[in-house]
Amino acid sequence: MSTPGAQEVLFRTGIAAVNSTNHLRVYFQDSHGSIRESLYESGWANGTAKNVIAKAKLGTPLAATSKELKNIRVYSLTEDNVLQEAAYDSGSGWYNGALAGAKFTVAPYSRIGSVFLAGTNALQLRIYAQKTDNTIQEYMWNGDGWKEGTNLGVALPGTGIGVTCWRYTDYDGPSIRVWFQTDNLKLVQRAYDPHTGWYKELTTIFDKAPPRCAIAATNFNPGKSSIYMRIYFVNSDNTIWQVCWDHGQGYHDKRTITPVIQGSEIAIISWEGPELRLYFQNGTYVSAISEWTWGKAHGSQLGRRALPPAE
């Protein structure tokens, strides 16, 4: 059975999440096209019609990034498939960001990935979306207006896009990793490091995934030329799979994590420990967003069964 609150959540909604340690924000679309925020501050709250931060085309992809929770950016598409930005800065609240004014039109089936660049106090942003020629395009904000960045090449039409960013302690600048799916259904990585720029190689992390499956990624414990990454995607068995990159081991340990509805979107956040939080739809109350957690103390387990407004 559903609940009145769960019925407000769009089935197969885009999902995005940001955090500052265990202070959490989750974004989703309601059945009227509005983007809402649910939050966790020692307990779950909000997600109601009073917590709308933007309006987007129905079925929009969602991406979000934050610097702690002082600056939050949430990305979606307008009815005309133009990239738009809902922005939050502590002290000024939510407002419409400058992105829509740049009029970057993307494919109607594009997904979105976004990151604040790590290791700097400046507000520098990178967004990844799919153009109508099916290439993955980077869009950059360095404080002086939105511009097109590097084009990462052709991908499967409608591919999921995962992205994460950190700064190695021995590197002068941020590192970026972007994951997407190619026409042959491989899940691949493009990489950027400050001393090399974008590497030309595509690194395959999974040989064959369902077409247009959701992809999400996070990282933790950046050190001296070392990083730990977790990449998630929805596999053909209708479960979320996890692919691990661990320092000294590279890509290894690919395993199923938790069941979802067919076509679920996913979002992942993490903090030191590590602690992992994954958000998805698994059929609870039909369309509620559910949570999976991992921590050293308790290992892998389901967290909140249904985020507000579902219960």
UniProtKB/Swiss-Prot annotation:
Chain spans, region 6 X approximate tandem repeats: 1-311
State the Pfam families in the record. Answer: Fungal_lectin
Amino-acid positions noted as binding beta-L-fucose 1 in the UniProt annotation, renumbered to this chain:
25, 37, 94
| Superkingdom, taxonomy of origin | Eukaryota
The GO cellular component terms are: early endosome
Q: How is it used?
A: Lectins have particular value as specific probes for investigating the distribution, structure and biological function of carbohydrate chains on the cell surface of animal, plant, and microorganism because of their specificity for defined carbohydrate structures. FleA is suitable for detecting core fucose on cell surface glycoproteins and/or a useful vehicle for delivery of substances to the inside of cells.
sequence repeat placement: 1-53, 54-103, 104-151, 152-209, 210-256, 257-311
What is a GO molecular function of this protein?
fucose binding
Residues involved in beta-L-fucose 6 binding: 44, 277, 291
Task: Give the matching InterPro entries.
Answer: Fungal_lectin
Residue sites binding beta-L-fucose 4 per the record = 177, 189
Which keywords does the record carry? Lectin, Repeat
Positions of beta-L-fucose 3 binding: 126, 138, 198
Which residues hold beta-L-fucose 5?
230, 242
Q: Where does beta-L-fucose 2 bind?
A: 73, 85, 146
Domain statement:
AOL adopts the six-bladed beta-propeller fold and contains 6 binding sites per monomer, each located between two adjacent blades. The 6 binding sites that are non-equivalent, and owing to minor differences in amino-acid composition they exhibit a marked difference in specific ligand recognition.
Its annotated function is as follows: Lectin that specifically binds to L-fucose and weakly reacts with mannose and N-acetyl-neuraminic acid. Has strongest preference for the alpha-1,6-fucosylated chain (core fucose) on glycoproteins among alpha-1,2-, alpha-1,3-, alpha-1,4-, and alpha-1,6-fucosylated chains. Binds to fucose residues of IgE in mice and human, causing antigen-independent IgE-mediated mast cell activation and anaphylactoid reactions in mice and is possibly implicated in allergic response to Aspergillus oryzae in humans.
Which family is this protein grouped under?
Belongs to the fungal fucose-specific lectin family.
| Quaternary data | Homodimer.
- Name of the protein described by the UniProt record: Fucose-specific lectin
Origin organism is Aspergillus oryzae (strain ATCC 42149 / RIB 40) (Yellow koji mold)
Gene, per the UniProt record: fleA
